Amino acid sequence: PKPRVGLLSIGEEEGKGNHLVKEATPLFKGSKLNYFGNVEGKEVIGGKVDVAVTDGFVGNVMLKTSEAVAKLIVDKIKSAIKNGGPLALIGGALVKPALNQIKKLLDPSEEGAAPLLGVNGLVFIGHGRSDAFAIKNAVRVAKNAVDANVLDAIKSAIEESLKK
């Protein structure tokens, strides 16, 4: 299946967005990509698209905001369980394994780094607050990308998608 590609913007309507978004829209529409159109942040998180294209600044703001919201939700659940009385504590004990799975899924140190696309090379960026576990995982992710020849695969896929 072809991944659904969206362009992160301030609204779904084609005319919305900054200069970069407006300039990118016809390039995506003219490609062989499965272009969904403009998407807002809620649609990225909600799964309407598989790939959200954005510039580094906006993408970083969205990423860090998403991480903060995830942490806030986890903290609120913990607080509600801790302060909710005996039944809440029992319920918390029952859901703890599931919550730990979700926490691990949302933990950026599990991957350690994300690829910076748009450069002619493999570049991975980690959090400035990465610990040894995150850095170890970042090296693992980067090594896997080198072993899988990801850069050439991305270049080939982009070249093919731009042919019409």
Annotate each PLM feature.
Residues 1-41, 50, 55:
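Glycine-rich phosphate/diphosphate-binding loop of Rossmann-like nucleotide-binding domains
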Residues 51-52, 56-164:
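Glycine-rich phosphate/nucleotide-binding loop
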Residues 38-46, 110-111:
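Glycine-rich oxoanion-binding loops at beta->alpha junctions
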